[in-house]
């Protein structure tokens, strides 16, 4: 729903809760930032490429930018979780998002076929604009949330995932690149 809210009123209220919490905490106990995972590609308007998608994505971008500005005012980092396909489906939105809408992006790199190419543009933009980028690996079992075997490391194991991360670090050579797992429960089961 936040994708519809170009004024970012609801998003800003959530950020405000975190910022208000921080004001009551000693410096060392404060929350450093927030990550937003707004998924406009799950909405009906996304399917209407020519007619409705551009307006939806502009509203999404404006919401993100408003949230970023507010988070910065409240001394919070602001990261945005994105899929691997914005570079091909809406490249101008992706660039504006990285340039003007976040401190960093977290790319849901949930397809093992070509993990480098799937996030090459995102890393290129992050590097160009001095932003961070996180490569998120999926760990849930195939069959959950329409995941297929190729989307997850659940059956390949953590060693294969770590080899992938090492390879991406070497290929990208970008100090702003980090890695994360989706999510804690399946990670615990794999350890």
Task: Label each residue range with its predicted role.
Residues 1-6, 57-91, 131-142, 181-182:
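Aromatic-lined carbohydrate-recognition surfaces of secreted/lumenal glycan-active proteins
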Residues 1-17, 33, 37-46, 85-87, ...:
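Aromatic-lined carbohydrate-binding surfaces of glycoside hydrolases
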Residues 7-35, 63-66, 94-98, 160-173:
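An active-site-proximal structural segment forming one wall of the substrate-binding cleft
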Residues 14-23, 84-97, 114-125:
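Alpha-helical scaffolding within the catalytic cores
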Residues 18-57, 176-181:
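Active-site groove signature of glycoside hydrolases
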Residues 28-35, 75-81, 103-106, 130-136, ...:
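Structural preference for beta-strand elements that scaffold enzyme active sites
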Residues 31-32, 38-42, 90-120:
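Aromatic- and acid-rich polysaccharide-binding/catalytic face
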Residues 108-118, 123-191:
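Substrate-binding cleft of secreted/luminal carbohydrate-active enzymes
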């Amino acid at each position: 729903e936040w994708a519809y809210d170009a004024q970012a009123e609801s998003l800003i209220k959530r950020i405000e809760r975190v910022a208000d919490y921080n004001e009551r905490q000693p410096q060392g106990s404060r929350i450093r930032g927030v990550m937003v995972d707004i998924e406009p590609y799950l909405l009906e308007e996304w399917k209407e490429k020519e007619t409705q998608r551009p307006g939806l994505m502009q509203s999404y971008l404006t919401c993100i930018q408003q949230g970023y500005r507010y988070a910065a005012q409240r001394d919070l980092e602001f990261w945005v979780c994105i899929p691997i396909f914005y570079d091909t489906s809406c490249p101008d939105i992706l660039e504006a998002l990285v340039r003007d809408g976040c401190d960093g992006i977290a790319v849901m790199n949930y397809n093992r076929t070509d993990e480098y190419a799937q996030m090459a543009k995102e890393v290129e933009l992050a590097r160009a604009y001095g932003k961070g980028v996180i490569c998120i690996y999926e760990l849930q079992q195939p069959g959950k949330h329409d995941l297929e075997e190729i989307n997850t490391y659940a059956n390949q194991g953590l060693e294969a995932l770590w080899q992938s991360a090492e390879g991406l670090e070497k290929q990208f050579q970008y100090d702003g690149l980090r890695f994360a797992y989706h999510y804690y429960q399946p990670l615990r089961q794999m350890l």
